[in-house]
Amino acid sequence: MKNKRKKYFYDTIEKENIDWHEHKNPIVKLFFRLKFAIAIRYADLKKDDLILDFGCGDGWLKKILPDYNIIGYDIDPKLTEIKDYTKLKPDKIFALDILEHMKKREIRKIIKSFKRMNPNFKLVTIIPTETWFWRKSRKLLGLSETVKDHITKLKDTLQILNEELTLVKKINFLAVTHIAKWKK
Protein backbone atom coordinates (compact mmCIF):
# COMPACT_ATOMS: atom_id res chain seq x y z
CA MET A 1 0.00 0.00 0.00
CA LYS A 2 2.76 2.41 0.90
CA ASN A 3 4.43 1.92 -2.50
CA LYS A 4 1.18 2.58 -4.40
CA ARG A 5 0.61 5.78 -2.45
CA LYS A 6 4.22 6.81 -2.88
CA LYS A 7 3.96 6.21 -6.63
CA TYR A 8 0.76 8.27 -6.84
CA PHE A 9 2.02 11.19 -4.79
CA TYR A 10 5.73 11.19 -5.49
CA ASP A 11 6.10 9.83 -9.00
CA THR A 12 7.95 12.90 -10.27
CA ILE A 13 11.70 12.67 -10.09
CA GLU A 14 13.60 15.91 -10.00
CA LYS A 15 14.32 17.08 -13.52
CA GLU A 16 14.29 20.29 -15.50
CA ASN A 17 11.02 21.85 -16.65
CA ILE A 18 8.68 20.27 -14.14
CA ASP A 19 5.38 22.12 -14.37
CA TRP A 20 4.89 22.55 -10.64
CA HIS A 21 1.60 24.44 -11.16
CA GLU A 22 0.07 21.39 -12.85
CA HIS A 23 1.84 18.77 -10.72
CA LYS A 24 0.15 15.39 -10.24
CA ASN A 25 0.51 15.71 -6.49
CA PRO A 26 -2.43 17.91 -5.41
CA ILE A 27 -0.50 19.27 -2.42
CA VAL A 28 2.40 20.41 -4.61
CA LYS A 29 0.00 21.90 -7.14
CA LEU A 30 -1.90 23.77 -4.40
CA PHE A 31 1.32 25.06 -2.82
CA PHE A 32 2.65 26.52 -6.07
CA ARG A 33 -0.69 28.05 -7.00
CA LEU A 34 -1.14 29.60 -3.54
CA LYS A 35 2.30 31.17 -3.43
CA PHE A 36 1.77 32.65 -6.91
CA ALA A 37 -1.65 33.95 -5.80
CA ILE A 38 0.01 35.71 -2.85
CA ALA A 39 2.65 37.21 -5.14
CA ILE A 40 -0.02 38.46 -7.54
CA ARG A 41 -1.97 40.00 -4.66
CA TYR A 42 1.21 41.71 -3.39
CA ALA A 43 1.74 43.29 -6.82
CA ASP A 44 -1.49 45.34 -6.71
CA LEU A 45 -1.83 44.97 -10.47
CA LYS A 46 -3.69 47.48 -12.61
CA LYS A 47 -4.96 46.73 -16.11
CA ASP A 48 -2.69 49.39 -17.65
CA ASP A 49 0.49 48.16 -15.90
CA LEU A 50 3.37 46.92 -18.01
CA ILE A 51 4.49 43.76 -16.22
CA LEU A 52 7.82 41.99 -16.66
CA ASP A 53 7.85 38.32 -15.71
CA PHE A 54 11.60 37.95 -15.19
CA GLY A 55 12.56 34.29 -15.47
CA CYS A 56 9.15 33.47 -16.93
CA GLY A 57 9.82 29.82 -17.70
CA ASP A 58 6.81 28.38 -19.51
CA GLY A 59 4.83 31.61 -18.99
CA TRP A 60 2.45 30.38 -16.32
CA LEU A 61 1.91 33.90 -14.96
CA LYS A 62 0.76 35.09 -18.37
CA LYS A 63 -1.51 32.05 -18.71
CA ILE A 64 -3.35 32.81 -15.48
CA LEU A 65 -3.50 36.59 -16.08
CA PRO A 66 -4.44 36.82 -19.79
CA ASP A 67 -6.05 40.26 -19.43
CA TYR A 68 -2.81 41.91 -18.28
CA ASN A 69 0.10 43.26 -20.31
CA ILE A 70 2.75 40.72 -19.27
CA ILE A 71 6.03 40.31 -21.11
CA GLY A 72 8.00 37.21 -20.26
CA TYR A 73 11.79 37.18 -20.18
CA ASP A 74 13.84 34.03 -19.79
CA ILE A 75 17.42 33.07 -20.61
CA ASP A 76 16.01 30.20 -22.69
CA PRO A 77 15.40 31.79 -26.12
CA LYS A 78 12.49 29.38 -26.73
CA LEU A 79 10.66 30.76 -23.69
CA THR A 80 11.40 34.48 -23.82
CA GLU A 81 9.24 37.08 -25.54
CA ILE A 82 11.90 39.79 -25.56
CA LYS A 83 15.64 39.60 -26.12
CA ASP A 84 16.57 42.66 -24.08
CA TYR A 85 14.31 43.21 -21.09
CA THR A 86 16.20 46.42 -20.19
CA LYS A 87 14.44 48.20 -23.08
CA LEU A 88 11.17 47.98 -21.16
CA LYS A 89 9.80 50.42 -18.60
CA PRO A 90 7.74 48.03 -16.46
CA ASP A 91 5.51 49.17 -13.64
CA LYS A 92 5.67 45.76 -11.96
CA ILE A 93 8.33 43.08 -12.11
CA PHE A 94 7.91 39.51 -10.95
CA ALA A 95 11.03 37.47 -10.10
CA LEU A 96 9.41 34.29 -8.88
CA ASP A 97 11.62 31.36 -7.90
CA ILE A 98 14.48 32.69 -10.03
CA LEU A 99 16.98 34.76 -7.99
CA GLU A 100 18.31 31.72 -6.11
CA HIS A 101 19.58 30.39 -9.45
CA MET A 102 21.95 33.35 -9.89
CA LYS A 103 25.27 34.40 -8.43
CA LYS A 104 25.21 37.34 -6.02
CA ARG A 105 26.87 39.71 -8.47
CA GLU A 106 24.32 38.78 -11.15
CA ILE A 107 21.44 39.49 -8.76
CA ARG A 108 22.88 42.91 -7.92
CA LYS A 109 23.42 43.70 -11.61
CA ILE A 110 19.85 42.71 -12.46
CA ILE A 111 18.35 44.76 -9.61
CA LYS A 112 20.38 47.79 -10.74
CA SER A 113 19.07 47.29 -14.29
CA PHE A 114 15.50 47.18 -12.93
CA LYS A 115 16.11 50.50 -11.15
CA ARG A 116 17.34 52.13 -14.39
CA MET A 117 14.35 50.87 -16.36
CA ASN A 118 11.72 52.63 -14.25
CA PRO A 119 12.40 54.53 -11.02
CA ASN A 120 8.84 53.81 -9.82
CA PHE A 121 8.70 50.06 -10.41
CA LYS A 122 7.57 47.50 -7.84
CA LEU A 123 9.28 44.11 -7.59
CA VAL A 124 7.65 40.96 -6.25
CA THR A 125 9.93 38.07 -5.37
CA ILE A 126 9.50 34.46 -4.35
CA ILE A 127 12.60 32.82 -2.89
CA PRO A 128 12.80 29.40 -1.24
CA THR A 129 13.94 29.48 2.38
CA GLU A 130 15.96 26.25 2.08
CA THR A 131 15.50 25.69 5.80
CA TRP A 132 15.47 22.31 7.48
CA PHE A 133 11.68 22.16 7.01
CA TRP A 134 12.02 23.05 3.30
CA ARG A 135 14.59 20.29 2.76
CA LYS A 136 12.48 17.70 4.59
CA SER A 137 9.39 18.74 2.61
CA ARG A 138 11.30 18.06 -0.59
CA LYS A 139 12.42 14.70 0.74
CA LEU A 140 8.80 13.76 1.49
CA LEU A 141 8.02 14.50 -2.16
CA GLY A 142 10.70 12.08 -3.28
CA LEU A 143 13.06 14.85 -4.36
CA SER A 144 16.60 15.55 -3.24
CA GLU A 145 16.84 17.78 -0.18
CA THR A 146 18.96 20.29 -2.06
CA VAL A 147 18.71 21.75 -5.54
CA LYS A 148 21.98 21.71 -7.45
CA ASP A 149 21.29 24.90 -9.38
CA HIS A 150 20.35 26.97 -6.33
CA ILE A 151 23.45 29.13 -6.12
CA THR A 152 22.60 31.99 -3.75
CA LYS A 153 20.97 31.49 -0.36
CA LEU A 154 17.97 33.46 0.87
CA LYS A 155 20.04 35.41 3.42
CA ASP A 156 22.46 36.65 0.75
CA THR A 157 19.71 37.47 -1.73
CA LEU A 158 17.78 39.43 0.90
CA GLN A 159 20.92 41.34 1.84
CA ILE A 160 21.32 42.49 -1.77
CA LEU A 161 17.64 43.37 -2.10
CA ASN A 162 17.71 45.33 1.18
CA GLU A 163 20.79 47.25 0.05
CA GLU A 164 19.28 48.14 -3.33
CA LEU A 165 15.55 48.47 -2.58
CA THR A 166 13.02 49.15 0.16
CA LEU A 167 10.95 46.29 1.50
CA VAL A 168 7.22 47.05 1.36
CA LYS A 169 5.84 43.81 2.80
CA LYS A 170 6.74 40.15 3.18
CA ILE A 171 5.50 36.78 4.32
CA ASN A 172 7.27 33.51 5.02
CA PHE A 173 4.71 31.26 3.40
CA LEU A 174 4.45 27.87 5.12
CA ALA A 175 8.03 28.33 6.38
CA VAL A 176 9.41 27.18 3.03
CA THR A 177 9.04 30.26 0.82
CA HIS A 178 9.79 33.95 1.31
CA ILE A 179 7.41 36.19 -0.67
CA ALA A 180 8.07 39.93 -0.72
CA LYS A 181 7.21 43.20 -2.42
CA TRP A 182 9.96 45.80 -2.94
CA LYS A 183 10.21 49.34 -4.28
CA LYS A 184 13.05 51.68 -5.16
Model-found features: residue ranges?
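Hydrophobic pocket-lining residues within nucleotide cofactor-binding pockets
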Residues: 75, 98, 127
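Generic recognition of short, well-ordered alpha-helical segments
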Residues: 105-109, 135-136
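A short glycine-rich, Lys/Arg-flanked "PGG" loop and its adjoining helix->strand segment in the class I
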Residues: 108-121
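A short beta-strand submotif of the Rossmann-like class I SAM-dependent methyltransferase core
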Residues: 95-98, 107
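Short, glycine-/aromatic-enriched active-site segment of Class I SAM-dependent methyltransferases
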Residues: 128-148
